[in-house]
Structures are given as structure tokens and as C-alpha cells.
């Protein structure tokens, strides 16, 4: 689900780039961004889909770091992101900000996100803020789930006020969590981190949002994630 009016032309974000003028694309965040052992990562899906659809017009750099919260992203921005001079930056953060010992208020989280956005604007990067996927509530804890929801609303507000792109997947994940709990659980391997299937599903959702297609020869690889995507969107169509 996409809510900021600027998002309606998000598929054009890659139009300025070619094999002779490549885009540097950075994913910035915590462990839900960081590459893990599970296999195909959601950011890999974007890289591969871009190559299928546009050719090698890009280089993708993963700057995820396990355990980070929004304060940490601000701290390491000048070291880990600014030198890369990204043309496009995807930010996914907020889970660790909900930890009780972090003592992060909603106002501080929103302020941190605004600062990150302005830092990226200063280096002339296009910005795609992403909301989270839904955790396993019983494992994550009611208070953290509620706080995560509040923080994601702050991300929506910052995207609107600062004019960034917003990729708002959380409402779709909430449908899976509430109506299809077994499916939802198959996408998460602990309380919050994505399984291999979860990464492929998130990647599929992302490339569809960006109006990119899957390679025909790889349809079988995407089949399980595609069935979940079809289930989800047939459900949302019925509810309208």
C-alpha cells in the first residue's frame, strides 16, 4: 500500500539511469536490511529484477547493520552512507527502536527520521522510506507491537511532510497476520526476522510496487511467494 502522492510515479525513479550512467542504490537499516544466511534477500530481488527489466543500470549496496535503531543510523550515516553518494536510498528501521531499554519516544523517532531524510536530501539522494512487516505478536510482545505501529505512522507522516517516497507494506502484512496466521508465520523465522520465503515475498511485493517484472525462466522460484501475493490481493479486492 502506498500513500504519499509522490509515490504514484515511483516506477519512474530509475528512468534517468543507463548502463553508462548507473544508479547507486543503498539499503540502509538494521538486521531486517542486513544480508543473512537464509538465501535470496528482498534487496537482492530488487537488484535482479532491475537487471531483468532495465539492464545493468545500477549497483546495489547493502548497508544494513544488525541491532541498529534510528539513533545508530544517524551516528553512522557520514561514515557508511554519505561517501557512497547514493542516487536512491531505501530506509527500513524501527524494530529496535521499540526495545524497552532503548527508551525511544515517538517524538524522538519521528525527529530522527526527519534528520535522516534531510541528510539524504543534502547529498541529493532520492529517498524511499519503508514501513515494517508485522512481527509474531506473541513473541514480540503487545507493547512493542503497538509501539512499532505508532513508529510506522510516524514514518508515513515524515514521508508526507518531507516529500519522500513511501513503500507502505505494513497494512498488507497485518492482513496476513490477522486473517492468515499460518501463512504469516511461514514468512517469519523468529519474532520479527524474515525467513527465506518472507524475503522473497517482500522482494516480490517491492518489485511489483516499482512496476518491475519477474524473469519468465524464474517463475517457479517465485511461485510460493506469488501464491501468497495473489491470496493477499484477492482478499483486499473483496474487502473494497
Residue ranges with predicted function:
Residues 1-66, 71, 76-85:
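Serine-esterase "nucleophile elbow" of acetyl-processing enzymes
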Amino acid at each position: 500500500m502506498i500513500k504519499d502522492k509522490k509515490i504514484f510515479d515511483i516506477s519512474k525513479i530509475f528512468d534517468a539511469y543507463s548502463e553508462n550512467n548507473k544508479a547507486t542504490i543503498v539499503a540502509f537499516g538494521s538486521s531486517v536490511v542486513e544480508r543473512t544466511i537464509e538465501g535470496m534477500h528482498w534487496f537482492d530481488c530488487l537488484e535482479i529484477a532491475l537487471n531483468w527489466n532495465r539492464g545493468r543500470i545500477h549497483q546495489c549496496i547493502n548497508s544494513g547493520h544488525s541491532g541498529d535503531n534510528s539513533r545508530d543510523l544517524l551516528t553512522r550515516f557520514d561514515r557508511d552512507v554519505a561517501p557512497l553518494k547514493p542516487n536512491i536510498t531505501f530506509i527500513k528501521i524501527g524494530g529496535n527502536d521499540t526495545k524497552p531499554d532503548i527508551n525511544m519516544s515517538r517524538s524522538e523517532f519521528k525527529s530522527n527520521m526527519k534528520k535522516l531524510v534531510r541528510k539524504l536530501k543534502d547529498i541529493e539522494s532520492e529517498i524511499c522510506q519503508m514501513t515494517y512487516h508485522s512481527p509474531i505478536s506473541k513473541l514480540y510482545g503487545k507493547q512493542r507491537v503497538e509501539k512499532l505501529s505508532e513508529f510506522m505512522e510516524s514514518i508515513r507522516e515524515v514521508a508526507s511532510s518531507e516529500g519522500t517516497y513511501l513503500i507502505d507494506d505494513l497494512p498488507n502484512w497485518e492482513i496476513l497476520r490477522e486473517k492468515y496466521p499460518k501463512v504469516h508465520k511461514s514468512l517469519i523465522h523468529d519474532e520479527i526476522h524474515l525467513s527465506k520465503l518472507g524475503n522473497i515475498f517482500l522482494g516480490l511485493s517491492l518489485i511489483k510496487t516499482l512496476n518491475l517484472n519477474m524473469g519468465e525462466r524464474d517463475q517457479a522460484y517465485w511461485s510460493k511467494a506469488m501464491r501468497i501475493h495473489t491470496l493477499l490481493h484477492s482478499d483486499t479486492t473483496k474487502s473494497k
